[in-house]
Amino acid sequence: MGILVFDVGTSSMKGALLNDKAEILCQFHRKYHPTFYSSVKVTQDPEIWRKALYDIARDVGDWCKDQNEEVEMISLTAQRTSIIPVDHKGDPLCDAVMWQDKRNIEVCTRLSAMNGQIIRKSGTMVNPVFSGSKMAWLKETQPEIYKKADRIFVVADYLLYHMTGQRKLDRTYASRSHLMNLRTGRWDSVLLDIFGIEKNKLCDLIDPGELHGYTNEKFAASTRLKTGIPVYSAGGDQQCSALGMGIYEEGDMEVTSGTGAFIIGITEKIPICLLYTSPS
């Protein structure tokens, strides 16, 4: 069995074909970079990601043809909070607002007055890196784009849509939006009201590791892979990183350093208070 795994980072995309023993049979990558217009404005053309996805899948397909192998399953993990408003065909209406973009800082400052409710429901306090405040900023500053948007994707559901045609998002990405109730695992009506986001702009939620759909004819024609390959959402890149480093039990912690740096730990219960602390 050949399992094709995509890892969509901020500065490159990697694709690796693994066998059923998790041994790497082949791997390919494409480099790219966001555009930094200023210290607060950071964007990227979403078509760069789609092209990289197709190019890597085509490389894997060519390798499989030469080696008499076959892709039987696809899984994808990606950066988590860059947003992409798309039309009903899944085509971008503007450049992606990257996770490093801080033009939503005024929105966050205003919403921080609601931190009590937001923390209790979403598990995190308002921060410009998360996608919900980026959506609120888009609605306030570019209302025509927001109005035209059939969905507001993050990078993962944008690419998964172009493989399967399904509008779904796994909960590891939604947990970084401030719009999902961390206790119910559902979009929360109170949080949606606070941020001013309509539920129909968001994708249906699934669990990480759940079947997202199957490769469609358009993807197959663009990559020379077959139709009907099951496609799974592996979860957000940092959650997958933690699992890959053996972080399974309460008390386990790991440090990841890439374009961003993270300290990640496991807890069995959601903390009651997640406010930041300092000596002062």
PLM features per residue range, with description:
Residues 106-111, 241-243:
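Pocket-flanking alpha-helical
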Residues 1-94, 120, 148, 203, ...:
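N-terminal glycine/serine-rich phosphate-binding loop of ATP-dependent small-molecule kinases
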Residues 101:
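Carbohydrate-associated surface elements
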Residues 276-280:
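Conserved small/polar residues in nucleotide/adenosyl-binding loops
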